[in-house]
UniProtKB/Swiss-Prot annotation:
It comes from Macaca thibetana (Pere David's macaque). It holds the Pfam family IL13. This is Interleukin-13. The gene is IL13. Transmembrane segments: none annotated. The keyword NAD does not apply. Cytokine that plays important roles in allergic inflammation and immune response to parasite infection. Synergizes with IL2 in regulating interferon-gamma synthesis. Stimulates B-cell proliferation, and activation of eosinophils, basophils, and mast cells. Plays an important role in controlling IL33 activity by modulating the production of transmembrane and soluble forms of interleukin-1 receptor-like 1/IL1RL1. Belongs to the IL-4/IL-13 family.
Length: 132
């Protein structure tokens, strides 16, 4: 009985070593890039019915600004996973209608073009090793 109890305790302790750990930023960025590639390659109809989003400044705070722009697009299942992934990169909670100083508020572009621009920028960041 004592041996069985010892084994249960040992397995419980070892179970902590096998538990999932946070995804490294490089892996998360690579997964986001792959998702954006899938979106841009699998377009048969206009992405999100041609919805328009605010253009963003890609030089700083790109993840939160991109999420702020895309969060206002509703009813578009093609970008839902991208929204969730961007949410993981953004340190603060983003809600619909939120405005950022990083957004270029006078320019709206189609979601498809926004995704392509974001993809090119994220590929550049990945090549340069800028994962955060």
């Amino acid at each position: 009985m004592a041996l069985l109890l010892t084994m249960v305790i040992a397995l419980t302790c070892l179970g902590g070593f096998a538990s999932p750990s946070p995804v490294p930023p490089s892996t998360a960025l690579k997964e986001l890039i792959e998702e954006l590639v899938n979106i841009t390659q699998n377009q048969k109809a206009p992405l999100c019915n041609g919805s328009m989003v605010w253009s963003i400044n890609l030089t700083a705070g790109v993840y939160c600004a991109a999420l702020e722009s895309l969060i206002n697009v509703s009813g578009c299942s093609a970008i839902e996973k991208t929204q969730r992934m961007l949410n993981g990169f953004c340190p603060h909670k983003v809600s619909a209608g939120q405005f950022s100083s990083l957004r270029v508020r006078d320019t709206k572009i189609e979601v498809a073009q926004f995704v392509k621009d974001l993809l090119l920028h994220l590929k550049k960041l990945f090549r340069e090793g800028q994962f955060n």
